[in-house]
């Protein structure tokens, strides 16, 4: 009897173990299931699924299969395969894997229908341009990152890059975009669809409380156009706005084009890095719209160019707006991952990494001939919490960073 009870108990334990294993799908050999976040096998499987999903999206795009599926209702799989001239068996496999990520579905066996996600790709061609750019340009370049490092070691290459290695060319990515309309179109679509902020630096600056400043002069230094300056002047009539266009912006012409002169802002020409001529400015704005290999030199030159204005008027502010990476923990994990992915992409394509905030602060506070004089006193944020710009003032070295002393612009 005892043997029978022991056997029944053993069978019950085995049944419980089997049931537990079936429910979790992970418990094997008596081991507890692992957290997916630390399960290396799960991590690799997820990567494999993402790779195949990307490949399937490219397949669907290049064979124009989505256009064969009605936006409303469904269509038999064999009809879609016949219309697109693809094997029905392969189409079925592709549909079933992308269905796991919410792209297409199979409402009834043997029928294909759009989801809310896949339908967007039918009406917005820039979405597939983004996918194609990711697969045909970003992926090949990213795979050459190690080759580039092995070739140059710790030195930062200025005339070489992952793009040139991936496509075996001496042409830079920027030059290739100028020559190739398709590459340029795909790149612009990719940038638009991977941005993690839904507003521009100009949007952030325009929503500040400029009315609180009263009748002061604001300079948009090294501007690429008059758009921001005119918008600011129209929004706040008490400001006297000066837009300083770089020589390159006006193509070296001595006269400002009439289309640039429209609006309330006063237009001037000032080459980058030359002394700021508006000595009574309360606010000077330096907007760096895109990452650049020369960003340190450019910011340093502009800080020196504005040093006299800031020194002579300690309540004056220089706003430095540049593409900055989010500080760890300040935004959601997905937003930070997207921002850092974008940073690596621009680095691999054109050797133009984005700046970390502490790096920009280091540039500001270690300007030659101005050390311990220029301080970052304020941060201007995007709505998602990322830093859009910093405010720089001429201050005594004993004053606290990020404090707002009397007389300072406080948005």
Swiss-Prot record:
<feature type="region of interest" description="Disordered">
    <location>
        <begin position="1"/>
        <end position="32"/>
    </location>
</feature>
<dbReference type="InterPro" id="IPR036388">
    <property type="entry name" value="WH-like_DNA-bd_sf"/>
</dbReference>
<dbReference type="InterPro" id="IPR036390">
    <property type="entry name" value="WH_DNA-bd_sf"/>
</dbReference>
<feature type="domain" description="HTH iclR-type">
    <location>
        <begin position="47"/>
        <end position="117"/>
    </location>
</feature>
<keyword id="KW-0539">Nucleus</keyword>
<protein>
    <recommendedName>
        <fullName>Cladofulvin cluster transcriptional coactivator claA</fullName>
    </recommendedName>
</protein>
<keyword id="KW-0238">DNA-binding</keyword>
<feature type="DNA-binding region" description="H-T-H motif">
    <location>
        <begin position="77"/>
        <end position="96"/>
    </location>
</feature>
<dbReference type="InterPro" id="IPR029063">
    <property type="entry name" value="SAM-dependent_MTases_sf"/>
</dbReference>
<comment type="function">
    <text>Transcriptional coactivator; part of the gene cluster that mediates the biosynthesis of cladofulvin, a conidial pigment not required for virulence but that plays a role in fitness and resistance to environmental stresses including UV light and low-temperature stress. With claE, coregulates the production of cladofulvin.</text>
</comment>
<dbReference type="GO" id="GO:0005634">
    <property type="term" value="C:nucleus"/>
</dbReference>
<dbReference type="GO" id="GO:0003677">
    <property type="term" value="F:DNA binding"/>
</dbReference>
<feature type="compositionally biased region" description="Polar residues">
    <location>
        <begin position="1"/>
        <end position="27"/>
    </location>
</feature>
<keyword id="KW-0805">Transcription regulation</keyword>
<keyword id="KW-0804">Transcription</keyword>
